[in-house]
Amino acid sequence: MAALGLLLQAAAACGSAGPLRLGRCYRGARGLCTRLAEPDGLEGARQEDEEEQPPPPGAEEQSTAMVKDSRDLLKEFPQPKNLLNSVIGRALGISHARDKLVYIHTNGPRKKKVTLHIKWPKNVEVEGYGTKKIDAERQAAAAACQLFKGWGLLGPRNELFDAAKYRLLADQLGCPDERWCSEGKWRSKSGPSLADLSTCWRRMEPDDPIQPMEQGRMPKAMRREELEEGELEEGELEEGELEEEAIDVSDYLPMAHQDARTPGRDASRGGSSIEMTDDNTAIRALTQFPLPKNLLAQVIQIATSSSTVKEYMQFRTVGTKTKICKLTLRWPCPMTFAAKGRRKVEAENKAAALACQKLKSLGLVDKNNNPLSHAMYNMTSLRELGENQRKPCHIKVPEATLRKIENYLNHYPVDIRESRPRIADDMMNLSKESGAISDAITGKTYIPMLEAEEVRLSQNLLALWKRRGSSWQESHPLPVDPHKDTILSAIEQNPVVVIAGDTGCGKTTRIPQLLLEHYILEGRGARCNVVITQPRRISAISVAQRVAQELGPNMRKNVGYQVRLESKPPARGGALLFCTVGILLRKLQGNPSLEGVSHVVVDEVHERDVNTDFLLILLKGIQKLNPDLRLVLMSATGDNQRFSHYFGGCPVVKVPGFMYPVKEYYLEEILAKLGRHRHRHYEIKQSDDECVLDLDLITDLVLQIDAHGEPGGILCFLPGWQEIKGVQQRLLEMLGSQNSRYLVLPVHSNIPMMDQQNIFQRPPPGVRKIVLATNIAETSITINDIVHVVDSGTHKEERYDLKTKVSCLETVWVSKSNVVQRRGRAGRCQSGFAYHLFPRSRLDKMPTYQVPEILRTPLENLVVQAKIHMPEKTAVEFLSKALDSPDIKAVDEAVILLQEIGVLDQREALTTLGKRLAQISTDPRLAKAIVLASIYRCLHPLLVIVSCLTRDPFSSSLQNRAEVDKAKAVLSRESGSDHLAFVRAVAGWEEVLRRRDSRARDNYLQDYYLYGPSLRFINGLVKQFSENLYEAFLVSSPSDCTMPSSVCNQYSEEEELVKGVLMAGLYPNLIQVRQGKVTRQGKFKPNSYAYRTKAGTVLLHKSTINREASKLYSRWLTYFMAVKSNGGVFVRDSSQVHPLAVLLMTDTDIHVRDDGWRATVSLTDSDLLVLEGDSYTIRLLRDFRVSLSKMVETCLCYEMAAIPGDLHHQHSQLLDILVDLLKGPPGSFGA
């Protein structure tokens, strides 16, 4: 620390001199280097001489002491880039610190080097090294955090201070004068904010010609800045890193002062030559501007975006006793000022004060004598750009295409209404009208069992049961077994029973068996048909397999499961069917009263997921239709009395569990075990709700448990897939050649069930099993050999922002009940250990239970489901019956959106479109895109896109995001579409599968960073959606959907049409791209893009290829997924779409303004699209749009296979013309 003190003293000594230039570099032991620099203005020869000198004695030892091992630094500062951003952001009142932290990358043969330029509170450089760019950046940032801590800018536990304290600390450090350029938030009074400019001015040649600045020309420094910014954007942004807050030029202009004078008005009239002025005038000017040289330098730096002022202002001083200074300015036009003084500095200050006086008269300094913002200095360019952006996009349609449109409209006038059969309602309700209902167990048509058949089947079941020998229950007793009679009696006597069973009591596997056994032994086994819901696919399958095993080979066929894309149902009559909640909801559409079902068991009801809460509403109503149905709610933890009260005070049967003792450790003890300091980021964030994981700490803890802990499996709870893969990769790297001694197994819904069976198997002797799982392993699955539980204390939770209408999947702290569940996983089979990676004080702040999902998610899909099951009720009426009713405003917003996209009418009834898409099991907007694709005959690519938006095909992780983005860009080619990249990725996968070459298959996955299990799942989704389309009468056969030769795929190769159909389904998810933006600090960026939606400004996430697009061919993007993070809304997937697709294919109203020669057309619900053209073209496009709309309406009223031949031919002509239109140029960008 003594060496660190020397370093800080040196920094403080240099700080008052202004910006620091690179000086000597002493390398630390672990590849980190901190450089203190020398004041700007020293001669180059002096620098060269110093660099030739050997390091002072002990310098290497001081450096080694000063710079810790990089690993220790990263443990002390686990998220260093975020921490630096937060300190500077809070100190300066800015949303990002990009201008104050510049990362310069140098690629070495084996290692990456990063030089971090820190421009606040002092100009200092630090270096970092790593095998990857992000590692080098993090090392450099950690070294910078160490400096900040030494300067007192961080608390003992790395906590932040308030802005006022940072200003005080900055004054003490003598830091540069920082302010919000346009708002004048605060000024440092501790000294000059720029270097002593006299040295560099003295070195300038006085006779250099001074040229005026060209109006509208951006200086060279702007290009340099953009390069640095580009380097920043190329690097990996850490999770949570702040994004720049900015507004587009058109929004900024009305906020700027209309009378603001700019260089383009007064200053550009020509230069002025000012002779020696009266000394009193100069003194008055100096009184008005006490630090004139600083102010001049600041104004010029801000206005010109230059890092140096040498080329814009020169001082030339002559004389002996009386010094005469001539100041020549090149900006805003050539001007010369002269003043005298007894000393050189006095003369220079007077001349500079006169220059400041002149700038203020030109309106280039504000009333408080502070610089204006960069945008205000560039108002001329800004206004020109704003005017350019406001111009409509000019559309010119080829004459040949116009003739085709004209001929079509002459042959099929838009004012002639087609006669459409009124068959839509009949068609969509065929099964109900015929009286046919589906069997909830088998999925086939339900036929009640005859009494004789029932008796015979019951006798067979009894015989099978008696032949099974000793039961599994007898040899493997569980805590629930002694309560068998109490449970069965309660279920027999009450329509609803709540079973509150502690973790490990056996309720999930045993109670369904108890019900089946009870009915069989009473001779009515054929009447026992139990549907058991599980919240997740993996638990439905694994529990079914476990129960089948326990029942033995004679009864195994009576147990089955059904999840999305996987089904193995049992025969009806003495059946146990395990399924997900979504599957049961689907079954209720075909069997609303659950005829033929004896019991519904809802397991894990305490998790309060949105589907379970919705199911409870329906089950409450079904009891009136089917009084014989028995409902069993099973809960591990939670407020069980609430469930009882919801169902009219039904009984609650409590079943105590058995758990071996579990020794618990919290963060304080864990850090002590690892020999670490307590000031971890968990404690930094302790006062906030935010939680950020330290994957290195988790990895180290797992290795510590392996080295010193008891034998047995380790279960690590992590919030999501990225964290699972991050810890898995770290473990495999650390274990190295010893990998064979470990079984590292991820558990996640992204992984197919067949790839996760190993988690239930005991590993061979000498092999340690390490399971990395989300909260899926809390209650849904049981891994019997777990001894150690590592609890991160976090999980992913979806939250919906009503204001921005955007969902956010956030990492949040779990509840106390979650902590209890996780701890219980360690004591199932023997004494265990639980390691909680949060302080005990955090446990006290955790909520008792989770917030129900229905209160924090978008409700559109739920409203559609409500209309299917109870169409006579309004959405608010239906959802008010929930255990926890969602906000009425949230329900109303969902209804409004569904009305906007044409799913509901004004009476809240399902439209013809709504009835079709209700058959498709996905988000309503994606379902709409699928329905439209069947009409526009480009179905297969849309099925692939929707499937990939449901399950990402790329093998993305925190470490390989950049490579995945590059692979996606390659697949996208020139389409400007993430969605078409999905289509090409899946098409390539199908091609290599057809070759039956395993090496080619593996190479393809590796080359494009694709994940095989996800691609298999996507293939299954495509098949499921094909079945849905068949059920909705939109295709003749499910196989038509994937056949290139089928009618529904006639235009599947037309990329602009595919993107247009996707946009039509997702609308109003439309982005207008505008060139030029102004940051919150007033920085004008003419070459940057701003992105506007109907709801407001958004940002493009790094995962979309259009974020890095150097040139967009269209000003319009469509998207599906937007997430809220760090106060901004980020779009993760996007496609550039043709403006004519937006005009012609959306189902919103349009407005046409026609003067008889030129016409403009715009959307009435937003200002995102304004097109112009000649009147004739616009009128033809308007009528053509009506024809397309009528085609969609007509097709929705027909069974697609039964559309008459003349209509089919007419629609083919229409689609041919549309394809031609979309092949035309999209119009000039910004013109």
Swiss-Prot record:
Positions occupied by motif DEAH box: 603-606
InterPro entries for this protein: DEAD-box_helicase_OB_fold, DEAD/DEAH_box_helicase_dom, DNA/RNA_helicase_DEAH_CS, dsRBD_dom, DSRM_2, Helicase-assoc_dom, Helicase_ATP-bd, Helicase_C-like
Region Disordered: start-end pairs: 39-65
One GO CC term on file: mitochondrion
Broad class of enzyme this protein falls into: hydrolase
SMART domains referenced in this protein's UniProt entry, alphabetically: DEXDc (SM00487), HA2 (SM00847), HELICc (SM00490)
EC number: 3.6.4.13
UniProt KW Mitochondrion keyword: yes
Residues of the Helicase C-terminal domain: 697-870
Domain (DRBM) ranges: 80-148, 292-359
Compartments, record wording: Cytoplasm; Mitochondrion; Mitochondrion matrix, Mitochondrion nucleoid
Keyword annotations of the record: ATP-binding, Cytoplasm, Helicase, Hydrolase, Mitochondrion, Mitochondrion nucleoid, Nucleotide-binding, Repeat, Ribosome biogenesis, RNA-binding
Catalytic activity line of the entry: ATP + H2O = ADP + phosphate + H(+)
Family statement: Belongs to the DEAD box helicase family. DEAH subfamily.
Function, in words: RNA-dependent helicase. Plays an important role in the assembly of the mitochondrial large ribosomal subunit. Required for optimal function of the zinc-finger antiviral protein ZC3HAV1. Associates with mitochondrial DNA. Involved in nervous system development and differentiation through its involvement in the up-regulation of a number of genes which are required for neurogenesis, including GSC, NCAM1, neurogenin, and NEUROD.
Designated name of the protein: ATP-dependent RNA helicase DHX30
Upper taxonomic lineage: Eukaryota, Metazoa, Chordata, Craniata, Vertebrata
Gene name of the encoded protein: DHX30
